[in-house]
Amino acid sequence: FPEHNVRYIAVNDGVDTLNKSAMDITPFRNILNEMYSADVSVKIKSAYRARFQQGKFMGTTAPYGYVKDPADHNHLLIDDKVAHVVREIFDLALAGNGIAKIRKHINKQHILRPAAYAVEQGATGYERYFEDNEENRYIWSENSVRGILRSPIYAGNLAGYKRIAANMKSKKRPSKLPEEWEVIPDTHEGIVTQEEF
């Protein structure tokens, strides 16, 4: 700041770039703040891991085919309104149909895609996917079908830690392979059996 003739004042921390003695302590204060952030991060991750290992669903929105239990928002119940769609997707896959063919079959039935259904159930943040075209609400993507077929949640298992977090500062979180995911079995009723999955 000083070399650009900018004065920085932080009243709460007692920092004033014109005061040399206050500036001498600033690097140490930054180190302490960094340590505090790291400590809080570790504690939050630990609390989330403990809840996950107890079989608690931690997502904000239930996966397609499920609703959150009104008595326990960390438990999933089958959503009878759309569970038949999930079953049909698995039945078609078990009959040897590929993802593209399954997608075409579902699209012909004019079924709300998962994001549109979530919005109808009160979820927010998904509108951008189809706000420009009402018909988009009924167009399933191959990724939606693939996601359902690959998710252990549909067999009653909770899957988590699907990404690698390098450190608390990094926004990059590459995906792990499905066999590297942490899975807690039998946390809720499955829409399909373990064998079908």
Question: How does the language model describe each region?
Answer:
Residues F1-F197:
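Conserved catalytic breakage-reunion loop centered on the nucleophilic residue
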